[in-house]
Amino acid sequence: QQEAAVAYQQTVLKAWHEIDDALSSYTAERQRNAQLAAMEVASRDAWELARVRYQHGMTDFLVALDAQRTLLQAQRAHAESNARLALGLVAVTKALGAQPAPEPAA
């Protein structure tokens, strides 16, 4: 009986660690995602400015092209973070013991 109690306690502690790890990862990714969203907005503003400056002959095409490249990199990083957020939410849900939602009827 004591062995069963110890095994149960170990199982509960393992579950708590899994929940804590999943929540920590998810929280960190949420913070990173917010930073990446801000970087995307700043990159979009920089690209718009570079594009307008190029259209008015105030800068060369390479400056506008570099700003666009930076924007695309920021968008990609933000999209990848969005995917990690979704996976992190799945990990939290699984750690909490929730069952996946059933497939809708066709």
Segments predicted by a language model, with ranges:
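Amphipathic alpha-helical coiled-coil segments
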Residues: 1-77, 84-95
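Amphipathic alpha-helical coiled-coil scaffold segments and their short linker/junction regions
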Residues: 101-106
